[in-house]
UniProtKB/Swiss-Prot annotation:
This is Putative ABC transporter ATP-binding protein MG187 homolog. InterPro entries: AAA+_ATPase, ABC_transporter-like_ATP-bd, ABC_transporter-like_CS, ABC_transpr_MalK/UgpC-like, Mo/tungstate-bd_C_term_dom, NA-bd_OB-fold, P-loop_NTPase. Residues 13-464 form the ABC transporter domain. It holds the Pfam family ABC_tran. ATP binds at residues 45-52. One of its GO terms (cellular component) is ATP-binding cassette (ABC) transporter complex, substrate-binding subunit-containing. The keyword Oxidoreductase does not apply. Keywords: ATP-binding, Nucleotide-binding, Transport. One of its GO terms (molecular function) is ATP hydrolysis activity. Coiled coil: none annotated. It comes from Mycoplasma pneumoniae (strain ATCC 29342 / M129 / Subtype 1) (Mycoplasmoides pneumoniae). Belongs to the ABC transporter superfamily.
Length: 586
């Protein structure tokens, strides 16, 4: 059944039109996203861009307002976190201080029912294989053994197949109902937000009117004028307050009407659902799944008893090779405790923490605590590993070492990983794919080099790279780029005449050479020594530019600096949309 599930989709995770609306703000705005299997994908962006909310939607900690979350092609939008087969690592490792490292690692296994079921399934298969070897040695035909295998496979796979069917039907049958229910829950928050916005706007109007009246009173030259101003102020305040109450009543009426409409639509939808064939099929499957596993188990046991009575399970006819096979199979049959201990030790070896299993979290370093948190997350062998800024609590040197280790560990285990960070250096060094986000929207998806070399818009261009990309307003005349009416570079480009935004990174700004390139001058307003070179900020033509300065020269704030810009490193953006414009040299 795992094979069937894996074949259903080549994607480990899919977002389909995901929206998370908190009422007063939209945290995720209609995101579509695909994470391939065995890939490390980083959600990158500034604080408040929606990356942690996106991770929480994947984890099942936040329910989307609309849209679908798919794991391996199956809809898990309504599934709780414990049913999603994933591991979580947060910025704060949340290790239990009163438990040893070993106890922290194994704790999730004792509380996971699906883990127990997996152990039972493995033990059952091992015992089945042993029985088949003995029955074959005692004369059972290949047809009889094939039938026994079929019944065993059916016993294991059929309940899973039914569960997947139920999941798919739940999605298709209740999709519209779920969206209506989500909108219904949002109405009180949206109504409250509208009233708060109205109150803020009204208070602002009152302040403006009072400020103007106060200024007028200060210049009033008679008691009569003062009285007129006060009278007008009183009237205006009365009008503003009356308007506030009217608008507030309108807001309440509007949202009450919306509430009533959605309730009516929801009632109609629920009635319509019950008339569909899919709903009838779903009811039948839900009833059947309670009894079918027991029936399949009985069928298997009944046939096995027939073969056992016919051929017996005595091992006298077994060859040395068959006895050896049975011995190996018996090793697979283990108790829950033994299996958990074995699994935890295997994970500890992979993460190189076997020597600290007996220690408490308080007695190990931050890097070791982070590895313990990862061990606890992967000990259940999740399909997906989610990491929310796991390196933020580490110092700079340990952060670099740990991110290198995480990358190697992820590649060795081939586990699909979603990594959240605001640190572009982390994202560039660790990722197969980067999802750059801003204001709840995906700005660009691609490899680290794609985002750096071909940013989709100005946000991506300035967010990736340190220091950030320089972007200036330029104009195009007959293919020539002009900055403040002067040529920016000597190269011409295939661009229509008009305004254009031009970007270039700090290392594309160099000292002048005798090659005919336009030379610009500016004033150095800051210098930062990075060891291998310096980064300066130069003010030129009213714009501050990041430039690279070589250590071979002495620079001080206030120095006049001359520079040229390399034409091959230019990026072009539309002034209206800020989107990238692909341009060729003439």
């Amino acid at each position: 059944m795992e094979k069937i599930q894996a074949e259903k989709s080549q994607s480990a995770i899919e977002f389909k039109n995901i929206v998370v609306d908190f009422g007063e703000s939209i945290a995720i705005d209609n995101i579509n996203l695909t994470v391939k299997k065995k890939e490390l994908v980083t959600l990158l962006g500034p604080s408040g861009c929606g990356k942690t909310t996106s991770l929480s939607v994947i984890a099942g900690l936040i329910a989307p307002t609309s849209g679908q979350v798919l794991f391996n092609g199956y809809d898990v939008t309504k599934k709780p976190p414990q049913q999603r087969k994933l591991g979580l690592v947060f910025q704060n490792y949340a290790l239990y201080p009163h438990m040893s490292v070993f106890e922290n690692i194994v704790f999730p296994l004792y509380s996971d029912t699906s883990w127990r079921e997996a152990i039972f399934e493995k033990n059952t298969w091992a015992q089945h294989d042993i029985n088949c070897l003995i029955l074959k040695a005692n004369g059972a035909t290949s047809e009889e053994l094939a039938e026994l295998n079929r019944l065993m496979q059916q016993r294991i796979d059929e309940p899973k197949r039914m569960a997947y069917q139920i999941n798919d039907l739940m999605v298709s049958v209740f999709q519209k109902q779920s969206e209506l229910e989500a909108n219904l829950k949002l109405i009180p928050r949206k109504k409250q937000f509208a009233i708060i916005s109205l109150s803020k706007e009204t208070l602002s109007q009152i302040r403006d009117v009072e400020t103007k009246a106060k200024a007028a009173l200060e210049t009033a030259d008679s008691a009569e004028v003062e009285q007129t101003i006060k009278s007008e102020l009183k009237q205006k305040l009365s009008e503003i307050k009356a308007n506030y109450h009217d608008e507030k009543a309108n807001i309440k009426a509007y949202w009450w009407e919306m509430l009533a409409n959605i309730k009516t639509e929801l009632k109609t939808e629920k009635t319509a659902i019950k008339q569909t064939n899919d709903y009838a099929k779903l009811k039948e499957l839900k009833w059947k799944i309670h009894f079918e596993p027991l029936n399949l188990k009985k069928q298997y046991r009944s046939y096995f008893k027939q073969l056992k009575a016919k051929y017996s399970l005595k091992d006298g006819n077994l060859t040395e090779s068959e006895l050896s096979q049975i011995e190996e199979l018996q090793k697979r049959i283990v108790s829950l405790k033994d299996f958990i201990n074995r699994t935890a030790k295997e994970v500890a070896e992979k993460l190189e923490i076997t020597k600290i299993l007996h220690k408490r979290p308080a007695n190990i370093s931050g890097g070791q605590q982070q590895r313990v948190a990862i061990a606890r997350a992967i000990v259940r062998r999740p399909k997906v590993l989610l990491m929310d800024e796991p390196l933020s609590n580490l110092d700079a040197k340990l952060r670099v070492q740990t991110r290198q280790w995480i990358r190697k560990f992820q590649q060795d285990l081939q586990i699909t990983t979603v990594f959240v960070t605001h640190d572009q250096e982390e994202a560039m060094s660790i990722s197969d794919t980067i999802v750059c986000m801003s204001t709840g929207k995906v700005q660009q998806i691609g490899s680290p080099s794609e985002l750096y070399l071909k940013p989709a818009n100005e946000f991506v261009a300035t967010f990736l790279g340190s220091p950030e990309m320089n972007i200036v307003n330029a104009t195009v005349k007959a293919g020539q780029l002009l900055w403040n009416e002067n040529p920016l570079v000597k190269t011409k480009f295939d661009l229509p005449d008009g305004a254009i935004r031009v970007g270039f990174r700090y290392d594309e700004v160099t000292a002048p050479k005798n090659d005919g390139s336009p030379v610009f001058s500016g004033t150095l307003i800051s210098v930062e020594n990075l060891g291998k070179h310096m980064v300066g900020v130069v003010e030129s033509n009213g714009v501050q530019l990041n430039v690279r300065l070589e250590l071979s020269h002495q620079f001080e704030v206030g120095n006049a600096v001359k520079f040229t810009i390399k034409p091959n490193g230019l990026h072009f953006f539309d002034p209206q949309t800020t989107q990238r414009v692909e341009v060729k040299h003439v």
